[in-house]
């Protein structure tokens, strides 16, 4: 028992350090590319000329594609293990291919730092899980390998999103398939250790998103949250179907990986000429929506262009996650509904923010089929725990409908 406690804490601390180092590497590339280190790719896009804005994501995609293509071409052996930590936990034995995972993470660093509309957290979690896998193979029994990889993945997610409980439930709901208490203990300890280490590295304790404090929802607001869950239940499968169609369309072109990723990048670059907000994973745009939401038409325009950029990035094979982009799409859809609902003052002056947070949780639940994780994650990322009952209700509704329409989640389809 003591041994597991010590290992869990150690994995949490190292995972947080890995996430922090990856973020520092992103800031370094941002300084090289844009001479700025504020971490906002949207601000970087707005500060450069149009031709650079159009070409930078394409060049990043080309560089990442060349790296992946060269590795595949000159690697004279088949991968000894997967590079997907979910596969390693669910159907594997906990082993990850070290060299392939490192190359994939480096390629992800290149595309996310150059503006592709893909999540950076995927590589962060992969690297944390990779360290846990290497450690487990050296110091743990084979039957424990999957547990320690799960701890690394949960810790990486907790550090990236400042959400230790949601990171733990992510593993429990999606990978273990149930809340297995015997396995959940070390996972929670690793996740909490990761968050504490992250707070030390960042010099403070803050939620990922800063929002105004919301009161407990009224009965009519509970109804609207449930209604948004219903909408997300239909929107989630459509989003996944669109990503699958985009991937099929890119594959049908039969391009070499460098050219395919460059094509995805140029699409993102051209869309950024209309709205610079399409650059990056969507974090800064979500923060802006939650604090100073624009009008309905502007939100709709950004949403359409950002959605196309996400489809181009993921469809072209850009290595990265779709977790944060999904949060953006959900926030934008929710804010659109909230802006419309705000025409009726009786619904409250905070209805826009409430709907945006509900949209984030429900679309995440509809795509991951993990309602408890999605509801708790939004609460942890914002500190708005008074919304938890309503978010749980709406997320369960969203997940139920999404499962009925499309039994395969975003992680099963990848």
Swiss-Prot record:
Entry's Gene Ontology cellular component terms: chloride channel complex; plasma membrane
CDD domains recorded: Voltage_gated_ClC
Superkingdom as given in the UniProt entry: Bacteria
Mutation effect (residue 207 to P): In strain: 487/90
Segment forming the signal sequence: none
Effect of residue 256 to S: In strain: 487/90
A biological-process GO annotation: response to acidic pH
Coarse class of the protein's main subcellular location: membrane
Alphabetical keyword list: Cell inner membrane, Cell membrane, Chloride, Chloride channel, Ion channel, Ion transport, Membrane, Transmembrane, Transmembrane helix, Transport, Voltage-gated channel
Membrane topology: Multi-pass membrane protein
Keyword Cell membrane: yes
InterPro entries: Cl-channel_core (IPR014743), Cl-channel_volt-gated_ClcB (IPR023790), ClC (IPR001807), ClC-type_chloride_channel (IPR050368)
GO molecular function, one term: voltage-gated chloride channel activity
UniProt-annotated location(s): Cell inner membrane
Membrane-crossing segments per the record: 5-25, 54-74, 116-136, 147-167, 169-189, 220-240, 255-275, 292-312, 327-347, 353-373, 381-401
Pfam families named in the record: Voltage_CLC
HAMAP family in the record: CLC_ClcB
Entry's family note: Belongs to the chloride channel (TC 2.A.49) family. ClcB subfamily.
General function of this protein: Probably acts as an electrical shunt for an outwardly-directed proton pump that is linked to amino acid decarboxylation, as part of the extreme acid resistance (XAR) response.
Name used for this protein in its record: Voltage-gated ClC-type chloride channel ClcB
